[in-house]
Amino acid sequence: VNIDSHYSLKLWEFYVKQMKTLLKPASDTPRFAIYFAPEIDSKLHSIGSQWLGRDSSSGKPIKQPYIKGISSSYFCSVTKTPRRYGFHATLKAPFRLNKEFTLKDLCSKTQRLSALNKPFSIDLKVQEFGNFIALMMDPNEQKMQNLASKLVENLDQFRAPLHQEEIDKRRTSTLTNSEDRNLLNWGYPYIFNDFRFHITLTERIQVRSDREFIASGASSHFSKSLDNATTVSSISLFFQESSKADFLQIQQFTLGK
């Protein structure tokens, strides 16, 4: 597997050392995910990482911006979960690796799939998504949905089956019949026709005035990087050592030309 030159060899070596934990029988084993994440030298990656307070490609903390009307401690708390996952949009949700396959198998297949899809552009804007704040795009944009669907279908062989407790946890949310079928058949509810692209910026924020303050702050913070369309030229492999660990971006796969 060729590692992109932007990525730290030290980080990759750290990851390889953790591979032995994949043999653990417990559910709390490492997970992988395929995300859209901006190129690590892009402005969007930089300001997105700053917003969350962590760079997922290096794992290093970053000072968060000041949001008018919101204390720094509160802002830190409402970005806690997104900070752990990194600045991204989910294409194939986190999964444990099927023991019949290796990391090299997963990377090779992901690289081949990437090469079959051409780069494209999307327009992002700050929106409320339920009680979350997120960067979202036109839901009618088909290229992103098609890419996500291909990844879900063609990489499913690498996904270990969900444990019953994982299914039960997902079902604590209100799922439609379609979402529940997706969960049982593919390991995640929000795929195919139920997919909605979003880059999560906050936890659920129940107080509307707080959501409005933070949404306004996000619009200001991201404004310069969202003036132009965002190019989707790669997809990324993320890795989580355990359920208590943060996700790390360990490789990007360039889309075909």
What are these regions (language model features)?
Residues 8-9, 97:
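A generic alpha-helix propensity feature with a strong bias for hydrophobic helices
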Residues 222, 231-240:
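Low-complexity, intrinsically disordered Gly/Pro/Thr-rich segments
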Residues 128-140, 237-244:
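Short, conserved secondary-structure transition motifs
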Residues 16-127, 142, 146-226, 242-257:
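Basic, often amphipathic N-terminal segments
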Residues 2-7:
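Intrinsic-disorder-associated, low-complexity terminal segments enriched in Asp/Asn/His/Tyr and depleted
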